Amino acid sequence: MSLRESPFPNGFLEGLHAVGWGLIFPCFWFLDRLIAVCISTTLERMWRLEQECYLHPLKVVFGSILFFILFVISTPFALLGFILWAPLQAIRRPFSYHKQEQSIPMENRNARWEEMGKISFGFLTANVCLLPDGIARFNNLGHTQKRALIIGKSIVQGVTRPHIRIFVDSPSSCGTVTPSSSLIPQPNASSYGSVDASGELPDAIEVNEITPKPNCNQNSNHQKHPPRSLRTLLRDADIPMEVSALFPPSVDIVCLQEVFDKRAARKLTQALGPLYGHVLYDVGVYACHPAGSCSSFKFFNSGLFLASRFPIMEAEYRCFPNGRGEDALAAKGLLTVKVDIGLQKGEKRMVGFINCTHLHAPEGDGAIRFEQLNMLSKWTSEFQTLNRRDDELPLFDVLCGDFNFDNCSPDDRLEQSHSVFDEYTDPCRAAAGKEKPWVIGTLLEQPTLYDENMRTPDNLQRTLESEDLRKDFISPPVALDGVPLVYPEADQPWIGRRIDYLLYREKSGHRTEVEELTYVTQLAGLTDHIPVGFRLSVSLDSEQN
């Protein structure tokens, strides 16, 4: 079955929707600029101090007046557009689908799958904080449109690099060697991270730039020092783990969260489409939900975004009904997708399932997140039962996203004990409330996003690799109210909050293992989360009869 690209059943309704949104957008944009002109990121404040720029108060005053006047003028047109736009949400499919032919090549890691008796798949999840610019600044991030384009092109450049494997004598340093320099333009002495000295993001890098290739000949006379591997294989790690300044190669499916801004979603789609020919974006519902009810009005979609190399056979979105506070304004939920891997074993076609979610955010609302975990566990099972066919062979079932709770905070004990962790395997989890010792937190402290140790992919990589450094830049565990926090326990490493998850469940009796797990620092200065990727290896010879 092929998905329809438009979220509307015909072009007439799609046109009406475009007219309605066209009337709303100027008012929305003026309000966004009104907020943005009043809020500076720490990067912009640092730049003004360095440049001794004292005109900013005038910019705030006159900019606020200008955008407020324009906002008021555009409001009547927005109300007219809203009358046209809102009723159409009841018949809108809760996602848009983009499909195009792949024009950027990627290494095929499964060319010899029949000979090897196994097949592997790469997955990536990241919260990219692509909110409207004014709101993103509350998270110390701005320039949403430029960030979206750079994020998309950075992903493409990272995942299309070759997978090179070398062998070294050290028992703790072997694996894939990758270039340590960022593909985002490197800052000069007066700049901060992926942003130049003027406080503006650099122009988007070209997709067809050639990625620098490492010298993998250890005996080369041209190499004064051995190449610094981006793979950090810890001696006590039970799976290969690395902190990498580049996205891992040959990622098959990318799942993003907080892609709330529609224009940013389109820029991501334009950047990723030539490589990932199947993209789901603008996922979620708007206006009154459920349709016809005024109990909950959704100003934002779910923020979920999925890009896949594999054709999408079926897709379904469900909205969590129990959001509260500011989270109730967004249609957070679960996106469940079935993909066609494009291979066959005997008479059976290989397929896979990917589930992407973003749970309730406010701390202290563990009961809400626990109920949302109940829902997603039920919904994933229902979707797979409904869309399972006898002539298909499911090979993977992955659940990923921003869960907004970790496995080390006393305040998150309720969610840590949920049965979803019995259904799915978390490769970073030792037990409820206890991480494996090599795990690294993924939630960055927002005030320090542009610190010297955070401002470039290489610097952030070194920070994450050092326990002494990362405890200053990764969010610490959340204590129970009124109970002093003792963390870490004696003889245990400092880990921090890991709220971005990649979980998997074995399918059809095939043994599934994590081939490699990667913490990615390539988006330094572009988001307040650490992207996480893993590669699953599925054995095709272990099917239980």
UniProtKB/Swiss-Prot annotation:
Enumerate the UniProt keywords alphabetically: Endoplasmic reticulum, Hydrolase, Lipid metabolism, Magnesium, Membrane, Metal-binding, Mitochondrion, Mitochondrion inner membrane, Signal-anchor, Sphingolipid metabolism, Transit peptide, Transmembrane, Transmembrane helix
The UniProt-reported impact of H529A is:
Severely impairs sphingomyelinase activity. No effect on mitochondrial localization
GO molecular function annotations of the record: metal ion binding; phospholipase activity; sphingomyelin phosphodiesterase activity
Q: Locate the transmembrane regions by residue number.
A: 65-85
Q: How does it sit in the membrane?
A: Single-pass type II membrane protein; Single-pass membrane protein
Return the annotated site residues (Important for substrate recognition): N404
Q: Which GO terms describe its cellular component?
A: cytoplasm; endoplasmic reticulum membrane; extracellular region; mitochondrial inner membrane; mitochondrial intermembrane space; mitochondrial membrane
Matching Pfam families: Exo_endo_phos
In the record, biological process GO terms are: ceramide biosynthetic process; glycosphingolipid metabolic process; sphingomyelin catabolic process; sphingomyelin metabolic process
Binding of Mg(2+), residues: E258
Q: What reaction does this enzyme carry out catalytically?
A: a sphingomyelin + H2O = phosphocholine + an N-acylsphing-4-enine + H(+); N-(hexadecanoyl)-sphing-4-enine-1-phosphocholine + H2O = N-hexadecanoylsphing-4-enine + phosphocholine + H(+)
Q: What class of enzyme is it?
A: hydrolase
Query: What is its subcellular localisation?
Result: Mitochondrion inner membrane; Endoplasmic reticulum membrane
Q: Which cofactor does it need?
A: Mg(2+); Mn(2+)
Mitochondrial matrix face of the membrane: 36-64
Q: What does this protein do?
A: Catalyzes the hydrolysis of membrane sphingomyelin to form phosphorylcholine and ceramide.
Which family is this sequence assigned to?
Answer: Belongs to the neutral sphingomyelinase family.
What name has this protein been given in UniProt? Answer: Sphingomyelin phosphodiesterase 5
What species was this sequence derived from? Danio rerio
